[in-house]
């Protein structure tokens, strides 16, 4: 069963394109891109998710990421 998102594909793809353009501008190799994006996720969790929910949200995020790369 597909997961329904409250965000449109257009909105998501637009943000991805902008983030990718910034990484391209800096000629960031794959490992640096992953490091930067991971640090962004960590910062977002620290600033926007209550402390008591962070571990759970991080776990859900990591599971979704792992599932998305399985194809």
UniProtKB/Swiss-Prot annotation:
<dbReference type="InterPro" id="IPR009857">
    <property type="entry name" value="UPF0352"/>
</dbReference>
<protein>
    <recommendedName>
        <fullName>UPF0352 protein Swoo_2786</fullName>
    </recommendedName>
</protein>
<dbReference type="InterPro" id="IPR023202">
    <property type="entry name" value="YejL_sf"/>
</dbReference>
<comment type="similarity">
    <text>Belongs to the UPF0352 family.</text>
</comment>
<dbReference type="Pfam" id="PF07208">
    <property type="entry name" value="DUF1414"/>
</dbReference>
